[in-house]
């Protein structure tokens, strides 16, 4: 053989390349020794060496390698000396180390020409990502544009805030008291006008048009650089509600109570919606809650007291008056002794201590040993609506003395001991702890009877009674005697919550007391603003 250096990829023998029609490639591959000798014999031929050398030079120089041959006859695929003269095996287009060469090839003719493979037709990929969401269908967009043109017709300079209310309600389908918040969201430069183009850019081009109502409201309420809603975000909303809702017109002469009403509504919203308790309502929390439905209801209902969720003035009145009754020095703060008087001294000292230790919720008021109005709103909602999840979480933290996530027998006994002592002092028939423990276990049906978890409480409709047994004597006794008045109330209005029933009873009581006081004074005189008492 000639002393020719053959690259590794070319030195590898592939039986298919020999193109022997007398023998199949399968036979050649099964006898590698014989095949190698055959290959060596061919490579020793001068003609083969010249052809291989020429191809190597072309390959090194980067020139295209052309291999020609004919497949017209049965002997045309043979190699020099062993095959007819003038034909040569083609070089493998890939190395023998390629995984593809492990696949068995069918014999091919040396003279076959390469087939031209047409490139696939390039089809444009439709856009699948939109920064502001997928744009609305053309039909919906056209309908919206027609309505926009109608409302902005004749207003070349744009609409002012009062004129913008119809746009908010008729085009955006949002509660009318969102008008100010939406207006300011669009009028970033505070010009006092929203032009047609500015509204289209925000509502149509920003794809607000096709978002669901919850997403629209969330984007309008939150600040631009935030991903959550805070209490201050509700201020313009509630200010407009107070200024425009027919059921709240009577408060316009008492701005201090307008402010208290707005605060109370906000606290109630965060109590029920902000489940994380961090003062920041996320989109997920907003979507899971019932605030949007309540807002839509408030916009449609002229009697604000029929909007029981969050916005009822009667509910605000009850909360504020209950706080005012306890705040004897009217500094808008209450201490432990003040709270002990709540519900006609219904609560135990031990539970009040736990409330003021702030294990259930950190007080927003920073005065040591004092509870502010916001803290009281959370307390009264938890106390009077023990069927709700926020209430169960509130009281669970109070009873769970070691904060280990379970309420044990010893922890329940610790709180019940004071209840037992109070019953004895009142000459009431005392119920032993062992008996009441069995009753509580039966009511909850915990997974493990040695302790009660928050999950156990959430799975039972009678969980509120367990807390009443442990620290509210009046409600415990009412439960033991099965107060027929309470049972009748529940049957008459099964859709109402415990809080709804409580607020209704208390409002009637407070109204009657107000009427008696007015009658004793001889006339219903105008409320003295300096007294900071409720107007009625």
Curated annotation (Swiss-Prot):
It is found in: Cytoplasm; Nucleus. It comes from the Eukaryota. Transmembrane segments: none annotated. Residues 526-536 have a biased composition (Acidic residues). GO terms for cellular component: cytoplasm; nucleus. The keyword Protein biosynthesis does not apply. This is Probable serine/threonine protein phosphatase 2A regulatory subunit B''gamma.
């Amino acid at each position: 053989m000639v002393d020719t250096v053959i690259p590794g990829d070319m030195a590898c023998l592939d039986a298919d390349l020999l193109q022997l029609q007398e023998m199949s490639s399968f036979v050649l591959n099964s006898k590698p020794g014989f095949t190698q000798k055959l290959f060596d014999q061919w490579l020793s031929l001068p003609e083969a060496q010249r052809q291989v050398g020429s191809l190597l030079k072309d390959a090194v120089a980067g020139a295209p390698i052309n291999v020609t041959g004919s497949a017209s006859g049965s002997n045309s695929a043979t190699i020099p000396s062993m095959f007819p003269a003038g034909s040569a095996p083609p070089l493998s287009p890939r190395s023998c180390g390629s995984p593809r060469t492990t696949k068995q090839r069918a014999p091919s003719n040396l003279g076959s020409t390469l087939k031209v493979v047409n490139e696939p037709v390039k089809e444009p990929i439709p856009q699948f990502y939109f920064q502001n969401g997928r744009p609305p269908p053309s039909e919906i967009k056209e309908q919206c544009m027609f309505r926009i043109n109608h409302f902005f017709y004749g207003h070349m300079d744009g609409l002012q805030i009062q004129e913008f209310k119809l746009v908010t309600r008729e085009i955006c389908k949002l509660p009318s008291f969102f008008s100010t918040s939406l207006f300011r969201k669009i009028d970033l430069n505070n010009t006092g006008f929203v032009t047609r183009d500015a509204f289209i850019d925000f509502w149509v081009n920003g794809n607000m048009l096709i978002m669901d109502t919850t997403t629209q409201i969330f984007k309008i309420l939150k600040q631009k650089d935030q991903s959550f809603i805070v209490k201050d975000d509700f201020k313009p909303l509630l200010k407009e509600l107070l200024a425009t809702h027919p059921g709240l017109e009577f408060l316009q002469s008492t701005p201090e109570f307008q402010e208290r009403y707005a605060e109370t509504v906000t606290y109630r919203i965060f109590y029920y919606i902000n489940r994380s308790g961090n003062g920041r309502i996320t989109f997920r929390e907003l979507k899971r809650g019932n605030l949007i439905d309540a807002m839509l209801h408030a916009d449609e209902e002229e009697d604000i007291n029929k909007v029981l969720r969050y916005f009822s003035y009667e509910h605000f009145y009850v909360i504020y008056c209950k706080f005012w009754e306890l705040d004897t020095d009217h500094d808008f703060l209450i201490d432990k002794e003040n709270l002990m008087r709540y519900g006609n001294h219904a609560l135990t000292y031990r539970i009040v201590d736990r409330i003021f230790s702030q294990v259930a919720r950190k007080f927003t008021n920073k005065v040591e040993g004092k509870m502010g109005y916001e803290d009281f709103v959370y307390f009264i909602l938890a106390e009077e609506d023990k069927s709700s999840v926020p209430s169960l979480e509130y009281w669970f933290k109070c009873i769970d003395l070691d904060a280990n996530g379970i309420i044990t027998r010893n922890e329940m006994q610790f709180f019940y001991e004071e209840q037992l002592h109070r019953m004895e002092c009142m000459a009431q028939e005392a119920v032993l702890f062992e008996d009441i423990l069995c009753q509580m276990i039966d009511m909850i049906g915990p997974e493990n009877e040695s302790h009660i978890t928050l999950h156990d409480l959430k799975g039972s409709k009678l969980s509120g009674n367990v807390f009443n047994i442990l620290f509210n004597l009046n409600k415990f006794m009412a439960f033991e005697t099965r107060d027929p008045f309470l049972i009748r109330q529940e049957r008459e209005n099964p859709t109402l919550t415990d809080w709804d029933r409580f607020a209704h009873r208390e409002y009637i009581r407070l109204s009657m007391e107000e009427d008696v006081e007015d009658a004793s004074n001889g006339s219903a005189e105008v409320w003295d603003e300096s007294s900071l008492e409720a107007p009625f």
